[in-house]
């Protein structure tokens, strides 16, 4: 009987341990997967610094182009498209975290004027939904609905990202006015070179931390290298760790200098930022303009008719 109770206790403990381990795995996996596209959100209250620089450039060091297309003018309480273009060579492959080569992903941050926000699903037309695809946009902060982020998403499918934007209505939002507003955008393709904690990823160049002679290069079992450098100044050994996926530029016995590249640069992506302007137009001004243009057209028509009438009178007088 005691043996049976012992086995039962062991079985319960094993089951509990497995459940706890599984729960930890799920929580950890979820936090990692959801944290990757929101590194900037976790570390910066505002994605645009006072200098105008978007903080994504702190991790994505290479400079690449990005473009944004928005209408010149929009009316209050209407939905419009903001199209962010992140061009790159679709044939390129990047170094993944596991050291293998894979396709590039893309991401973007869109900084709208105060009052502008992501359009609700019921306001988005079927044509616009088709352009958006399966993208899921997030607010940068719960209280910053005018700043939107997306990514990482497959670059081959979403090198052009369509944001559905709802324009504010000054009639219901007294903080909004009929003015010209700036829009800022940042877009990246590929992985970053630096993590938010300041450590390097395996998508950048690794340099020698000391000058001297390379006495040993050890290839690690799971990939990557340990490079032992004998410091020329004091004879001590310095070991530089190279993560997997990188190509070495040095060999054993070679003399190297401090900060000399030990690997080639694997990065094929980069980050870019741009801006555009949009006018929130007063409908009354549009109506006034249409009325003015209509008046001008009518005046021209009356002038033409008057001229023809005058010509007829002159012609009849000449006939007499």
From Swiss-Prot:
Q: From the UniProt annotation, give the residues forming the signal peptide.
A: 1-35
Q: Which InterPro entries match?
A: Cyt-f_TM (IPR024058), Cyt_f (IPR002325), Cyt_f_lg_dom (IPR024094), Cyt_f_lg_dom_sf (IPR036826), Rudment_hybrid_motif (IPR011054)
Give the keywords, sorted: Chloroplast, Electron transport, Heme, Iron, Membrane, Metal-binding, Photosynthesis, Plastid, Signal, Thylakoid, Transmembrane, Transmembrane helix, Transport
Tell me what topology the record assigns in the membrane.
Single-pass membrane protein
GO CC, sorted alphabetically, is: chloroplast thylakoid membrane
Annotated TM spans: 286-306
- One GO MF term: heme binding
Q: Which GO terms describe its biological process?
A: photosynthesis
Q: Where in the cell is it found?
A: Plastid, Chloroplast thylakoid membrane
Residues annotated as binding heme: 36, 56, 59-60
How does this chain assemble? The 4 large subunits of the cytochrome b6-f complex are cytochrome b6, subunit IV (17 kDa polypeptide, petD), cytochrome f and the Rieske protein, while the 4 small subunits are PetG, PetL, PetM and PetN. The complex functions as a dimer.
Q: What does this protein do?
A: Component of the cytochrome b6-f complex, which mediates electron transfer between photosystem II (PSII) and photosystem I (PSI), cyclic electron flow around PSI, and state transitions.
Q: What is this protein called?
A: Cytochrome f
């Amino acid at each position: 009987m005691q043996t049976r109770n012992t086995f039962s206790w062991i079985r319960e403990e094993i089951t509990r341990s497995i459940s706890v381990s599984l729960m930890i795995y799920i929580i950890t996996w979820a936090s990692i997967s959801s944290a990757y596209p929101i590194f900037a959100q976790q570390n910066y209250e505002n994605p645009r610094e006072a200098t105008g620089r978007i903080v994504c450039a702190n991790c994505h060091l290479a400079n690449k182009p990005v473009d944004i297309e928005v209408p010149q003018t929009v009316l209050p309480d209407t939905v419009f498209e903001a199209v962010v273009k992140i061009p790159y060579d679709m044939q390129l492959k990047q170094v993944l975290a596991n050291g293998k080569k894979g396709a590039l992903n893309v991401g973007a941050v869109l900084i709208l004027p105060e009052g502008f926000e992501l359009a609700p699903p019921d306001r988005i037309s079927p044509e616009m939904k088709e352009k958006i695809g399966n993208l899921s946009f997030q607010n940068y902060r719960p209280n910053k609905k005018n700043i939107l982020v997306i990514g990482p998403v497959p670059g081959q499918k979403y090198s052009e990202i369509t944001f559905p934007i709802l324009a504010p209505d000054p009639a219901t939002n007294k903080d909004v006015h009929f003015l010209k507003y700036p829009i800022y955008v940042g877009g990246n393709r590929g992985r970053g070179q630096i993590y938010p904690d300041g450590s390097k990823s395996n998508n950048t160049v690794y340099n020698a931390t000391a000058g001297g002679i390379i006495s040993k290069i050890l290839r690690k079992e799971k990939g990557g290298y340990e490079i032992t450098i004998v410091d020329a100044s004091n004879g001590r050994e310095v070991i530089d760790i190279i993560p997997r996926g990188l190509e070495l530029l040095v060999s054993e016995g070679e003399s190297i200098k401090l900060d000399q590249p030990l690997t080639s640069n694997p990065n094929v992506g980069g980050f870019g930022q741009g801006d555009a302007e949009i006018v929130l137009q007063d409908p009354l001004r549009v109506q006034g303009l249409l009325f003015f243009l209509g008046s001008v057209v009518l005046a021209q028509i009356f002038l033409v008719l008057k001229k023809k009438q005058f010509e007829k009178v002159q012609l009849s007088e000449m006939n007499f």
